Design a protein with these regions (language model features):
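Helix-loop-helix "hairpin" substructures at the membrane interface of multi-pass membrane proteins
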Residues: 14, 146-228, 251-256
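Pore- or pathway-lining transmembrane helices of multi-pass membrane proteins that form conduits
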Residues: 41-45, 94-119, 232-244, 260, ...
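Membrane-embedded helix boundary and interhelical linker motif in transport proteins
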Residues: 31-86, 90, 147, 247
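Membrane-interfacial amphipathic/re-entrant helices at transmembrane-helix boundaries
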Residues: 1-22, 49, 61-72, 98-102, ...
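Short, non-helical or kinked segments that cap or interrupt transmembrane helices
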Residues: 25-48, 97-102, 177-180, 198, ...
Length: 305
């Protein structure tokens, strides 16, 4: 039971990271009706920006961990948000009214551009980082010596996810931008007729999704202690799977799907072969979609004619 509890903690932490990335996928799909296949690479860019910012701050002699974290979060969110804005302007906006495959192909092309750009700029090797947040708490020690531990970095990941979810929920439900986003989700043409700046709203959707992906990249960097140019592809596919599993277009579903994928991966790695953890996650997705085509929290679309 102690081993199970430890894996439950690990799975929830990993799922929190997937959930933050998945929100970006579901936001864009909910408002634009398209999948941003470059979003995983935006997550990777956020991780690299966090790493570079951290190294620059350390080189100046700054040692206060809270100050370093705050600066890294703000810088990585700001720069990565700019990447999100650029992707929308370059890869999506010119093709928004083209045939449906055009924006998808453009996004895939942008994904390759970002991946290879990062490989050239940062190299193909994994970039490690020394532990920034250490220590933790012992929750329980069994008679056979197994210890249930909750590390400080796990606490930071979970608290950061909860805070960002609360802020984002407030933004969507209580602000003018959130109202515009919900209006565009319902009907872009009608929203434009009612005075909503549709182009600006869609751009802000990409910006917010990229900022959340930047935080996820930072959490990944702190949790695993490394980044590499290929991590965006793997994490992006899993986060997209999480968004579909939870119900693409549903924000709570994106987080629920992220937690589900994180738990499936962690428990499979703990009790079975780690080599097949991805197979297990995608198999669960297939089973869920067979019986629930819209995902766990997705709503069926009804088109009136």
């Amino acid at each position: 039971m102690d081993y199970f509890t430890q894996q439950l903690i690990n799975g929830l932490v990993l799922g929190s990271i997937y959930g933050l990335i998945a929100i970006g996928y579901t936001m864009v799909y909910g408002i634009v009706g398209m999948i941003n296949f470059a979003h995983g690479d935006v997550f990777m860019i956020g991780g690299f920006i966090a790493l570079i910012t951290f190294l620059l701050l350390v080189s100046t002699g700054l040692t206060a961990v809270p100050v370093i974290l705050l600066i890294v979060i703000l810088v990585s969110m700001a720069i990565t948000a700019l990447y999100g804005w650029t992707i929308e302007r370059v890869a999506y906006r010119p093709l928004r009214h083209s045939f449906r495959l055009a924006p998808m192909l453009s996004a895939i092309g942008m994904s390759f551009v970002l991946t290879n750009y990062s490989q050239v700029a940062q190299g193909a090797r994994v970039k490690p980082i020394p532990p920034l947040i250490t220590g933790g708490y012992t929750l329980h020690e069994s008679a056979d010596g197994f210890v249930i531990q909750l590390s400080n970095i796990q606490i930071v990941v979970v608290i950061t996810t909860i805070v960002l979810l609360a802020i984002f929920t407030w933004l969507v439900s209580r602000t003018r931008l959130g109202r515009d986003m919900r209006a565009c989700e319902q009907d872009q043409t009608m929203a434009a007729l009612l005075g909503v700046d549709v182009d600006r709203t869609i751009s802000m959707t990409f910006v917010i999704g990229a900022a959340l992906a930047a935080v996820a990249g930072l959490m990944y960097l702190l949790y695993y202690g490394l980044v590499d140019f290929f991590m965006g592809f793997v994490a992006g596919i899993k986060a997209f799977t999480a968004a579909v599993l939870g119900g693409i277009g549903s924000l709570p579903g994106a987080m629920l799907g992220g937690l589900a994928i994180g738990l499936i991966e962690t428990f499979w790695s703990a009790y079975f072969s780690v080599e097949y953890k991805d197979v297990a996650a995608f198999s669960i997705l297939i089973v869920v979609l067979i019986f629930m085509p819209t995902g766990l929290l997705g709503r069926p679309e009804v088109e009136k004619v």
